[in-house]
């Protein structure tokens, strides 16, 4: 009998359930969007119960389609989970009831808490311990806001029944049934809380103590056990529905899942997801590397008790730059037309578009600038601006990868790509040309559901569907496209130099003119 693996893909705007065969091909799927709640500017919430319901609905829908195609449900050997990271849920450990909406990873309401934490003694040592800098992104500041502002959360804390977790922990807890108390999280998610020691993959009492105060001793809060990303028993079984009794055997945060789905198992392997923004993960091997360029240190995966680590960097404007041309400048109503427009010119005509709409992330970390276009002449056409918009993403990707290579000590081996912008042949060729001096291939799989596939791989590995990493490397290889540089490295270097000059020239634009 053929073997299949289910994958729960719980994202920021929708939930999905996909069923993959052993070759990594999706054979059935179902998707459901859920409510986005914005109570105030900068606040972003989800209803935790609606998320669970959406996951159940997706499982039912995908399995129904799977059965209609003549497949047996019993051929599904394992189920994995991948999820939006950092999003924070608090609930009562006894009743299983959520005490407040989930605070989403994009939420910035805890800025004042971050400012206060940065003033505490030992704040400058946090990154060395947990891999993350203090910001509004990690789960800890969301938890602190809830403790200080929501009476039901404080009441549960005082009763000793307050449970805290990221979306993976909440889903596992609820899918099993709260009475079973299966309360676990994998290291790729636990590493985003700032409570986990990046070196030991265990909760660090010093970190937990740092974030507490006279009113709240965070060690009293119930936190999930940290277990391997791929484990045949730790995640329990689904307690109800069409897959009741089926085992949950793997879990990965979304960006780590994408790296696994791209089979980035070797040190020096990198993946870039070109979405609204871009998320780059770079495998650094079996030891965590603390960046000197402001990159994040995270866990790539832990399948067998020997974790692999990654450096993570992000680019704020990728696909959103294309949308800017469409919505703000009226270039087109179709994103594919933007890349066609970029292809109407042979080069950028000397034009550079630094798409720093809200500053630039690593390795630049420039906050005192805005989007800037250099090199406009009377010969500039819309195609030049469109091409420069694509190039901006590719130049920033080059800068992030170079910083990762320097930090890690592992030469860049390859770049695996996915996400909406990777559909553009032109954009991927531009990326290959900009990386000419690195002499590495850019590999784009035909099947680009790599995040969901990563969760399926984690689950299937624990269930014995795949026996080793060599077998996994053969998954999802059919029809992949390889892009290699067509430009000479010396010519590529000229464009990189011009880009870096433009970045430096736009520093300091945001100043007080009064």
Where are these regions (language model features)?
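Phosphate/ATP-binding catalytic cores across multiple sugar-kinase/actin-like superfamilies
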Residues: 58-65, 255-258, 385-413, 501-514
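Conserved ATP-utilizing enzyme core subdomain
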Residues: 15-18, 169, 173-182, 323, ...
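Acidic, glycine/GT-rich loop-and beta-edge segments that sit at the periphery of enzyme/chaperone cores
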Residues: 321, 462-514
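Activation-segment/catalytic-loop signature of the eukaryotic protein kinase fold
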Residues: 349-444, 451
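ATP-dependent carbohydrate kinase catalytic cores
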Residues: 189-306, 310, 316-321, 326, ...
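N-terminal glycine/serine-rich phosphate-binding loop of ATP-dependent small-molecule kinases
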Residues: 1-100, 128, 155, 242-247, ...
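Short beta-strand-loop/turn "lid" adjacent to the catalytic site in phosphate-handling enzymes
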Residues: 66-104, 133-137, 172-197, 227-228, ...
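Glycine-rich phosphate-binding/hydrolytic loop that grips phosphoryl groups
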Residues: 115, 257-261, 311, 391, ...
């Amino acid at each position: 009998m053929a073997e299949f693996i289910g994958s729960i893909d719980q994202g920021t705007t929708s939930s999905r359930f996909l069923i993959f065969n052993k070759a990594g091909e999706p054979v059935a799927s179902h998707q459901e969007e859920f409510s986005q709640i914005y109570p105030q500017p900068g606040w972003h919430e989800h209803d935790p119960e609606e998320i669970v319901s959406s996951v159940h609905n997706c499982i039912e829908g995908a399995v129904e389609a799977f059965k209609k195609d003549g497949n047996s449900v019993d051929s599904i050997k394992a189920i994995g989970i991948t999820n939006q990271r950092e999003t924070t849920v608090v609930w009562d450990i006894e009743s299983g009831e959520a005490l407040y909406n989930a605070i989403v990873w994009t939420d910035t309401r805890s800025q004042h808490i971050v400012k206060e934490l940065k003033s505490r003694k030992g704040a400058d040592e946090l990154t060395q311990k947990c891999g993350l800098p203090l910001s509004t992104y990690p789960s800890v500041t969301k938890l602190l806001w809830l403790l200080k502002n929501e009476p039901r959360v404080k009441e549960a804390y005082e009763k000793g029944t307050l449970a805290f977790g990221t979306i993976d922990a909440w889903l596992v807890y609820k899918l099993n049934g709260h009475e079973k108390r299966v309360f676990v999280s994998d290291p790729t998610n636990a590493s985003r809380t700032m409570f986990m020691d990046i070196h030991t993959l265990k909760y660090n009492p010093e970190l937990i103590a740092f974030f507490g105060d006279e009113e709240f001793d965070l060690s009293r809060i119930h936190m999930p056990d940290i277990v391997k990303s791929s484990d045949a028993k730790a995640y329990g079984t689904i307690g109800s529905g069409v897959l009741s009794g089926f085992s949950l055997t793997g879990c990965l945060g979304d960006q780590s899942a994408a790296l696994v789905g791209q089979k980035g198992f070797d040190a020096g392997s990198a993946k870039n997801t070109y979405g609204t923004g871009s998320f780059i993960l770079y495998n650094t091997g079996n030891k965590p590397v603390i960046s000197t360029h402001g990159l994040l240190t995270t866990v790539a995966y832990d399948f067998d008790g020997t974790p692999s680590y990654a450096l993570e960097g992000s680019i704020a404007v990728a696909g959103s730059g294309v949308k800017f041309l469409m919505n703000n400048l009226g270039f087109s109503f179709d994103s594919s037309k933007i890349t066609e427009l970029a292809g109407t010119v042979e080069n950028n005509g000397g034009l550079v578009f630094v798409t720093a709409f809200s500053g630039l992330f690593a390795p630049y970390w420039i906050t005192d600038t805005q989007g800037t276009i250099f090199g406009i002449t009377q010969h500039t056409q819309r195609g030049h601006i469109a091409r420069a918009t694509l190039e901006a993403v590719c130049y920033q990707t080059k800068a992030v990868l170079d910083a990762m290579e320097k930090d890690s000590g592992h030469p860049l081996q390859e770049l695996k790509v996915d996400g909406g912008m990777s559909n553009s042949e032109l954009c991927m060729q531009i990326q290959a040309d900009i990386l000419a001096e690195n002499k590495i291939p850019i590999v784009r799989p035909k099947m680009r559901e790599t995040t969901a596939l990563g969760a399926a791989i984690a689950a299937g590995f624990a269930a014995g569907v795949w026996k080793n990493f060599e077998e996994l490397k053969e998954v999802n290889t059919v029809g992949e496209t390889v892009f290699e540089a067509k430009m000479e490295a010396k010519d590529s270097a000229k464009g990189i130099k011009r880009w870096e000059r433009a970045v430096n020239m736009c520093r300091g634009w945001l100043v007080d003119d009064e």
